[in-house]
Structures are given as C-alpha cells and as structure tokens.
Swiss-Prot record:
GO terms for biological process: cell division; cell wall organization; peptidoglycan biosynthetic process; regulation of cell shape. Keywords: Cell cycle, Cell division, Cell shape, Cell wall biogenesis/degradation, Isomerase, Peptidoglycan synthesis. One of its GO terms (molecular function) is racemase and epimerase activity, acting on amino acids and derivatives. Its EC number is 5.1.1.23. GO terms for cellular component: cytoplasm. It comes from the Bacteria. It comes from Xanthomonas oryzae pv. oryzae (strain MAFF 311018). Pathway: Cell wall biogenesis; peptidoglycan biosynthesis. The combined activity of MurD2 and MurL provides an alternative route for incorporating D-glutamate into peptidoglycan. The gene is murL. This is UDP-N-acetyl-alpha-D-muramoyl-L-alanyl-L-glutamate epimerase.
Length: 451
C-alpha cells in the first residue's frame, strides 16, 4: 500500500493563508486530514505594498478567495468527502461560488477518472452574509492576462487602440509568454506561482490527477494583484466559443474550458464586485466574439507572427516541450491553423507554423475531431464544431487550399453530409451575446472589432 492512499482520506483542509505586504508573497496552506502541510506561494512584484482600511479588507477578501479557488489543485488529489476551513469562515454566497468552480471546473477530470462529483463537494457555511464591498477609488488601469496565444494579443491591441492604460500580466516562468509580452512594448507584470512540491510526489504515489480550472485560479491571482497595485480592471480574452463543451455520449456536456466560459465569468465577476471591491471590474474583452472572429482580428497585424503560440505542448507543467513554437500535431495547432487560414495568405500562415498542416493526410483524424465527424470535440480550448466546419468549407471553395490532403478529404467525404446553410461565415462573425465589458469601453472596441 502506498504512503498516500487517496481512498483513506476523510477531509481536505484549508489550513491558513497570509500575505506579507513587505515582500508581496502570499502563502496558501492546505492539508489532508492531519497530514503534512502543503504550502503554495504566489509572489506579486512591486512590494512593499501599503495596505490600510478598506484596501486591507479587500485584499484579505481576495486572498481568501484565492486560497479557496487555488485549493482545487490539491483537493483533486484525493477528492475526500469532507472539506474544512480552519482559520476563517465563509458565507453561503462564497461557498456556492467555490463549489461551482470545483464541480464544473473539475468536470473533465471527473469524467476521465470515472468519478461522480455531483452532491459530493460541500464547503462549510459558518458566516452570515457579508455587507456589500465598498468602492476603493481604484485608478483606471487594466491588468491584462497574456497567455502567449492569439486571443490575448487581440485584446491588448484593442485596448491600446481604445486608449486604455494597461499592464501585460502573466503567471509563471514561460519564456514564450515573456517574449510575447515584451513584444507588446507595454509595462509587464510577471507573477510567480510555486505549487506545493509535495503535490508532484502525491501524483507519483497514485493521487487522482487531471485537468483543473486554471483560468479560475489565474483570475483570482490577478484580482489580488490588481488590488495590491490599486487598479480597477482585470481583463481576460475568452471568446463566446469557450462556453461550449464537448458532447459525450451517455454523459452530456463536459467543458474542458469551463472557467473560460460565460457562466464562470459572470459568477466570479459579480462576486468580486459584491464581496471584494465595488469598483474592480473583471471581464473578458472577447466574450461577444466567436473564435473565427478573433482569428480574423488577429490576422490584421503581423506584429506577433514570429512570437505567438497557442500550442498546448509549450505550456504543460510537466512533459515534453517542442523546440519549435508549434508542435503541429496537437488539437490547438490543428484548430489555430484552420481558424487563421480563411483570413490570411497561405504563405504567411505556413511561415508561422513552419509547415502546411492541411496538406498532411496523417492529420485527418485530428481534424475529424474538430469537425465533430465520427468523434467529439477535443478536451482542449478550441472553437465549436460548426466553426471548424465553416472554416473548412471556406477553404474548400478556394483554389489555393482545395487540393490539400485534409481539405480534399473534407470535400469528398464530409461536406456532402452537411447542410450548406450551416456553413455560412457571416453568422459566426456577428458580435453578440452577454458580456461584462464596461459600456463606455465596449462602444470604443466594438467599432474596432466590426471592421
């Protein structure tokens, strides 16, 4: 029997959290039962931070929210039946938000591990509903999350065009993201996050492992960083398509990118304004756009062609990293190549990737999954099936693409089964749907997106 037996653990504990204003280091402490403490640290540059009065209260609220949400990385190792919060208490609204993050954010993890989480995740409610958080007089400035891919770069350029002061922000030590961030020419904020080293040992000892809602964790980190820096906006770049999951026969919808979707954005953003700071806005600038609309926007500038990468193999915590920015075989590479193809010259796209992914017959299976042909949409941050089908149909009508192996196969085997009315590009370019973008800003960026 291994030293860590996930089936024998009864309680996951949120032991304590603290922030050292002199160093900017937040310490998040967890434990299973009476086992050793699991200590994670998050380091926000710019210390020392002067915290007093309402600002200190808001920072404490944000710190506890981060402690609760970041705990998902450790909770999943055993998924025990009980949860305890040792050093503070939470109200029903906080418990509901965090339970939702754990339940839906671990949806793919539960599906892959054959676990049933519904009704199993209960955060203890021991506090009365809190009074509404006050406005703090935060200065107008955006912390913009950058991930190294096309989406955040579209947001950064749209905010630049709209005249919004911004700081390009990321978490962790990715050199690829740093290169992209520096390419923007804007101020940067690189936040450090060090997971408890014991977590990797638990994984070796048979802990449950799998995908977590990392955007939820990063959102909580950036809310804390925004308060420490006294700024009023945290901006992500999640588009409309992120709200749609993979349809699994016998299971229903499982959304790999749930914390990039509208349900999370709405719940988290509303919570922050009610419980943390009334004038701190959390929103995704691209929410009203489809993946294809974002791709069209990105194609308007070649400023980042030699720097960006959406390839997930560059970003796995553990595992191989390709020498090139694009591995060419993962679902993200497949999708981004396909999404950009209708909107830029073929030579430019092939230059970016270093090869033509659509003229390689061995890639057909990967594209079938994107098209939802004989397979479900991959568990990746990729667009809806109809977006992929529409993009492929556009290429099928173009002389420069229609002889390429994957496109040719689409024309022969797949397109005849599809309704041409479902393959129109214009509806996918519509700017529509709910969002949390401040109204005055939305008027400015909407005009830019519509061109």
């Amino acid at each position: 029997m291994s030293a860590f037996d996930k089936h024998q653990i009864s309680t996951f504990r949120f032991v304590r959290c603290a922030l050292d204003a002199q160093t900017g280091v937040a310490t998040l402490v967890y434990a299973f039962d009476q086992g050793p403490e699991l200590v994670e640290t998050v380091a926000v540059p710019g210390a020392p931070f002067a915290l007093g009065g309402a600002n200190a209260t808001a920072v404490q609220q944000a710190l506890q929210l981060l402690h609760l949400i970041a705990g998902v990385s450790y909770f999943k190792a055993a998924v025990p039946p009980n949860i305890a919060i040792d050093s503070y208490s939470i109200d029903a609204e906080t418990a509901a938000l965090v339970q939702s993050v754990y339940l839906h954010g671990l949806g793919e993890f539960a599906y892959r591990n054959g676990l049933q989480l519904h009704g199993k995740i209960r955060f203890p409610v021991a506090a009365q509903a809190a009074a509404a958080a006050p406005a703090l007089g935060l200065r107008v400035h955006a912390l913009v999350a950058i991930g190294g891919g096309k989406d955040s770069l579209v947001s950064i350029e749209a905010l630049r065009h709209a005249g919004v002061d911004q700081t390009v922000s990321w978490i962790g030590g990715s050199q690829l993201i740093r290169a992209c961030a520096e390419r923007t020419g804007l101020p940067v904020l690189n936040i450090g996050r060090v997971l408890a080293p014991e977590l990797f040992e638990l994984n070796r000892q048979g802990a449950w492992n799998g995908h977590i809602p990392v955007t939820a964790v990063n959102s909580a980190i950036l809310v804390l960083a925004a308060l420490l820096n006294g700024v009023d906006q945290v901006v992500f770049s999640n588009e409309r398509s992120a709200s749609y999951g993979s349809q699994i026969p016998g299971t229903g919808e499982v959304n790999h990118q749930w914390s990039k979707g509208w349900a999370f954005e709405q719940a988290f953003g509303d919570y922050v304004q009610r419980h943390v700071a009334a004038d701190l806005r959390y929103y995704s600038l691209l929410r009203p756009l489809s993946e294809l609309a974002v791709a069209r926007q990105f194609a308007k500038t070649d400023r980042y062609d030699a720097h960006f990468s959406s390839c997930n193999r560059n970003f796995h915590i553990m595992g191989e990293r390709p020498v090139h920015r694009w591995c060419g075989v993962c679902p993200k590479c497949h999708f981004v190549f396909l999404a950009l193809a209708p909107f830029m010259p073929k030579t430019r796209l092939v230059n970016i990737f270093g090869r033509n992914l659509l003229d390689d017959a061995t890639q057909a299976g990967g594209y079938d999954a994107l098209l939802e042909f004989q397979d479900h949409k991959p568990f990746e941050c990729v667009g809806e099936g109809r977006e992929s089908r529409t993009a492929m149909a556009v290429l099928a009508s173009r002389a420069e693409w229609k002889e390429d192996a994957v496109v040719k196969r689409f024309i022969r085997d797949i397109q005849p089964q599809l309704d041409p009315n479902d393959l129109q590009v214009e509806p996918l370019m519509a700017i529509e749907g709910e969002h949390r973008i401040p109204p005055a800003l939305w008027e400015r960026v909407r005009a830019n997106f519509a061109v």
